A protein has these predicted regions:
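Conserved DEDDh/DEDDy metal-dependent 3′-5′ exonuclease domain
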Residues: 36-108
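Hydrophobic side chains within alpha-helical segments
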Residues: 30, 74, 94, 147-148
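Conserved RNase H-like, two-metal-ion catalytic cores of nucleic-acid enzymes
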Residues: 1-57
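Generic detection of short hydrophobic beta-strand segments and adjacent strand-loop junctions
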Residues: 43-44, 173-175
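Acidic, Mg2+-coordinating catalytic module of metal-dependent nucleases/exonucleases
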Residues: 115-173
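Anionic, Ser/Thr-rich low-complexity intrinsically disordered regions
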Residues: 111, 174-179
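A residue-level signal for conserved active-site and pocket-lining positions in enzyme catalytic cores
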Residues: 7, 110, 144, 148
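A polyampholytic, Gly/Pro-enriched intrinsically disordered region
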Residues: 103-119
Length: 179
């Protein structure tokens, strides 16, 4: 089965588009996938969104972090007839929320589980887009995809991942991810 790990960055911030209700107006700046078939990354820009959507649709499973609540919603205006929310998807943030009843960040899970950190933030990614620093933007997105992939693989192999609580203590959460 081809597993596709996916993340995207946007051209705008919520404050630029009038809030979360206008998520589709954020617009894709950069997206990155990693596929188990190729064991490699692919970078997509806004003009490449049709190819990105085709790759997501061809996946046996899509893996992401907040992909259902964010990434798929950002993609909706590019493919209004596609039903991305019905793709076979493991949204790691959503899965952890169902167990914990609160949201955890990718950075918290990455630091606690892997000892890795995100290299920047979504705000920084928008700034890089606006400054034309496309290599930095795509490298940042690749790092997020790689971290997400490694968290998924860790959870598959060990049956748990970890996160840092608001008090800074490392906590373990059981996962039952199909691998």
């Amino acid at each position: 089965m081809n597993i596709v790990v996916f993340d995207l960055e946007t051209q705008n911030l919520f404050e630029d588009v009038g809030g979360r209700a206008n998520i589709g107006a954020l617009k894709v700046s950069c997206a990155v996938t990693w596929t188990s078939v190729r064991n490699d990354f692919t970078v997509y820009w806004e003009k490449d969104v049709p190819a990105l959507i085709a790759e997501l649709k061809s996946a046996g499973r899509v893996i992401g972090f907040n992909v259902k609540g964010f990434d798929y919603e950002v993609l909706r205006p590019y493919a209004p007839t596609e039903r991305l929310q019905f793709l076979p998807t493991l949204d790691i943030m959503d899965d952890l929320f169902r167990t914990l009843s609160f949201r955890v960040s990718l950075d918290s899970v990455a630091r606690a589980t892997l000892g890795a950190t995100k290299s920047a933030s979504g705000i920084q990614a928008v700034e890089w887009w606006r400054a034309g620093e496309l290599v930095r933007l795509s490298e940042y997105c690749k790092v997020d995809v790689d971290v997400t992939r490694r968290i998924y693989e860790f959870g598959c192999e060990n049956g748990f991942v970890q996160y840092f609580s608001r008090l800074g203590t490392k906590q373990k959460v059981q996962v039952k991810w199909k691998c």
